[in-house]
Amino acid sequence: MTNRISRLKTALFSNTREISLERALLYTASHRQTEGEPVILRRAKATAYILEHVEISIRDEELIAGNRTVKPRAGIMSPEMDPYWLLKELDQFPTRPQDRFAISEEDKRIYREELFPYWEKRSMKDFINGQMTDEVKAATSTQIFSINQTDKGQGHIIIDYPRLLNHGLGELVAQMQQHCQQQPENHFYQAALLLLEASQKHILRYAELAETMAANCTDAQRREELLTIAEISRHNAEHKPQTFWQACQLFWYMNIILQYESNASSLSLGRFDQYMLPFYQASLTQGEDPAFLKELLESLWVKCNDIVLLRSTSSARYFAGFPTGYTALLDGLTENGRSAVNVLSFLCLDAYQSVQLPQPNLGVRTNALIDTPFLMKTAETIRLGTGIPQIFNDEVVVPAFLNRGVSLEDARDYSVVGCVELSIPGRTYGLHDIAMFNLLKVMEICLHENEGNAALTYEGLLEQIRAKISHYITLMVEGSNICDIGHRDWAPVPLLSSFISDCLEKGRDITDGGARYNFSGVQGIGIANLSDSLHALKGMVFEQQRLSFDELLSVLKANFATPEGEKVRARLINRFEKYGNDIDEVDNISAELLRHYCKEVEKYQNPRGGYFTPGSYTVSAHVPLGSVVGATPDGRFAGEQLADGGLSPMLGQDAQGPTAVLKSVSKLDNTLLSNGTLLNVKFTPATLEGEAGLRKLADFLRAFTQLKLQHIQFNVVNADTLREAQQRPQDYAGLVVRVAGYSAFFVELSKEIQDDIIRRTAHQL
């Protein structure tokens, strides 16, 4: 890492995070002037107004220009989506447990007196709340499931970066002008053209700023850099990039612009090493210094950490630590099925090893053809302990997409949005994180409904759980589809849609079914706890008959605080096998019930003509979802977290080592889980030391691939180090750990999430 990159890193995190009202004020100012116009045009005009008037900056020593806010890592508001939680939490932002932000008293006053009164009763949240039935509201209030993305832009998508970079904005504007001429009444085309032209003007503002700064700069080297930024910006406003610097700059400008349009999470990066390779090679051919090109890439990686998301207190518990979702996958397959590793794949990991920040959320695609040197480079990067890169298995994911009707060529081109959500870049609107389903809460409801049922059998209970899962899935689908319609009718994204295949051919926004592939992704959470609980209950009550069902239920209701409660809990924990130890009897319960969940989910259609797709990952939702579930037959206390990750074993229950964990997860139908899965594994640093440690990790990754698991990620850290960081956070400000599908600064996580990471089983190989 160069001195420049070190200073850029330091500067990014040297100030307190603040809330900026600038986007909200500009958006509102435009919106006041467009009453009565079509929603998609109002949205486009508001975004264009932001691009014209928002304050811009180029920070000291930056090689890549473009900042969403002048101050680093500032949160921005989108009251047009949901003004109510913002009003409620204005005074809580600086002191809340997770994701704190400073906000001035003047900004609070402006929000209360100007922004909230305008958006009250005219936001997307008002529409969604007005459509939700009482039954759906009751289920979400008890957290049987959650409906997400009701308060902000949807995101969770990858635009067609090759189209942007290989054609350039000038050509794209010309194409959109033709569409407008052919269909002059089409509001989508009008909105997209308006925003493409506004993007050009916004980029030219940076060119002018760089020229002004250069004229006043006394340092010769920095003056030349600023003039180059100006030249690149003027070129990118009209023409396609020719060099790596130009490509990186246009790539980042578009990321910033899309943030203004929707303020959404997980506007992910796709297969960066594939579409950026021609520009990197062109720069090498032109004689550019490889060391400088690496510094450019490191600059871009640092920039990815400048965007943080302002979430509600509740949402921050589900998505703790700013998982912005700048996810990029490396390697994988070419369109003809060969290994896709290239020189830029290596450079992306090298640059990450230098910066070691939470974003970008890099991943590596493995398969039977994976290049051994690149596998070793991957293992070397994992060993650093930041949880990056995560690993995805082509041997599972490609068939999973084929099973959903995706073409073979498109399936081989898959990438990931957000944490682990599977998507086809530039062709999919997957609504990937629309809902989370609390499987353990459903079991708890069934247990309580059977109190006093002397005729209850294990098979009868299992059938009731299946039926109840099916029932609540119908409600989850109902709520998800209402949210889907809310985004269509209140929050279209015409600029983003112009970079998604088939939207231009159809003349429709992605929210209106314009994309080639239209999914709605929902996550089943708690399968490990569910199977552990049912296995223990079956043994304790129905086979060994040590307690009656009502006696066990009484102990659970008391949270094990009965005269025999601790003995009962010890037996439940220690005498009955747990998922994650390669024991068929309990693993098969997981497999059967998760398959039931998947098959039920995939029955349903969304308003865009696509189907629901199941996944199993938690982000950090295993903590809040566990908080609403009482004590359970796996020995879990009331309110205790669920198993992390999605497919990970419960904390402390994976006693037979990491290979046994792989074997347990391999018994699940990973192919059905086409919205993504998540498996966390924690290693002690000592087990990966030296060349031998790297080879052991590489072999473990090959075993993961051969066993046909879909996803795996790692923490490589000592629990003692994490405990020290809790006590002395000022000494561990740069400590990055894996949470669930993303990495975060350990000291920026709430204590409950920190404790969760500390408690995860640390394995040895």
Show the residue positions of the predicted features.
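Extended non-globular scaffold/tether segments
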Residues: 190-201
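A conserved hydrophobic secondary-structure block that centers on an alpha-helix together
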Residues: 214-221
